[in-house]
Swiss-Prot record:
Keywords: Cytoplasm, DNA-binding, Endonuclease, Hydrolase, Nuclease, RNA-binding. It is found in: Cytoplasm. Its main location: cytoplasm. It comes from Escherichia coli O6:K15:H31 (strain 536 / UPEC). The keyword Cytoplasm applies. It holds the Pfam family SymE_toxin. This is Endoribonuclease SymE. PROSITE patterns: SPOVT_ABRB (PS51740). Its EC number is 3.1.-.-. GO terms for molecular function: DNA binding; RNA binding; RNA endonuclease activity. It is an enzyme of class 3 (hydrolase). The keyword Acetylation does not apply.
Length: 113
């Protein structure tokens, strides 16, 4: 039992009742035997408002009686330099040497013969 002088600290719920959604597990049929498999479909403008825009990668954690969906942050865009480096790596050895020589000239280094 709690102490008579204990006071419960008020807190704000992480999920307000206005943000709750009610769903029903339906089914999808699987070809070729058309067996029914459980399915949950989520759709609506509220998904984007919650951080789940079209194309967002989603991490799914499954526990007994609980599924947690977490939007993954977008991958950092690769710099132009790194994209160019990847293209150079696909070139022949001779062309790669030419690119290295060009970089040396641009950087101001003199080629020692």
């Amino acid at each position: 039992m709690t102490d008579t002088h204990s006071i419960a600290q008020p807190f704000e719920a992480e999920v307000s009742p206005a943000n709750n959604r009610q769903l029903t597990v339906s089914y999808a049929s699987r070809y070729p035997d058309y067996s029914r498999i459980p399915a949950i479909t989520l759709k609506g403008q509220w998904l984007e408002a919650a951080g789940f825009a079209t194309g967002t990668a989603v991490d799914v954690k499954v526990m007994e009686g609980c599924i947690v969906l977490t939007a993954q942050p977008p991958a950092a865009a690769e710099s132009e330099l790194m994209q160019s480096l990847r293209q150079v790596c696909k070139l022949s050895a001779r062309k790669q040497r030419q690119v290295q020589e060009f970089i040396g000239v641009i950087a101001g280094k003199q080629k020692v013969a």
